[in-house]
Amino acid sequence: AEVVVGFGGYVSTPAYLAARQRRIPIVVHEQNARAGLANRVGARMTPFVATTFRGTVLPHASVLGMPLRREVSQLDRAARRDEGMTAFGLDPQWPTILVTGGSLGAQRLNTSFASRAAELSAAGLQVLHVTGAGKEFEPERPDIGAPYVVVPYADRMELAYAAADLVVCRSGANTVCELTAVGLPAVYVPLPIGNGEQRFNAAVVLAAGGGLLVEDAAFTPEWITDNVVPLAGDGERLFAMGSAAASVGQRDADDALADMVHRAYASRPAPRADAVGGQGGSA
């Protein structure tokens, strides 16, 4: 290896230690707002340290953001709105709420929204609900009203984002970064486990006014009625929140991280004279 790039987790620590022993440049990228142990160790070994969020405490850190798929980072939501509507069988006349708990789904979101499907449709609020595989349900809705579309997963999330006016979701680092990159307002419901990193991940966009946060236990059907319904129907407020979200979003983190890797590569120490001589003698 000529550069070791680590993103944290238990496998990164031995890689960082081996790279330091072999004088191989190290690049550390911390995805979450609160740095994990492996990256706290790795950041002490290199000047090439990248964070996703402002406020993450690591030595030598530069805020680069989260590298995202180009389909998301370069998304023009307005230009692709009709395509997104068609892809999911939605009706462009209605405001659209995207509900997603990630690839595995989120039981709290699924059950709370399922119990309010008829109310949302009657209120003229269209829902695209990504439940997670095996967690689909048949929504109850009135004969006349906005569609409520349930899918187990979405392999073209950029089209779901293009169709959406508001997102209700967990606050994993990747989700927060995707939504801010494309300028979508969101209601964040942090996963209630771990060391609270999901709450910290949403802190920057919340401070900017680009989202709301509600704890998992408080996200009830009644909370949807009292908060999601009026918010989703308030186009002016959604526009302001979307602009605020976009103000903290970063669309070029992939290029910025690649540039840091190139700079790390260029910083490699010159081969030792004895190593060069030894290679020549064995040729």
Q: Model-predicted segments: where are they?
A:
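A short, well-ordered alpha-helix in the C-terminal region of glycosyltransferases
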Residues: 237-251
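Donor-nucleotide binding loops and adjacent catalytic segments primarily
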Residues: 77-169, 176, 199-206, 214-223, ...
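Conserved donor-binding/catalytic loop of nucleotide-activated donor transferases
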Residues: 22, 162-164, 178-189, 208
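An aromatic- and histidine-rich active-site surface loop
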Residues: 3-22
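C-terminal alpha-helical cap of glycosyltransferases
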Residues: 250-283
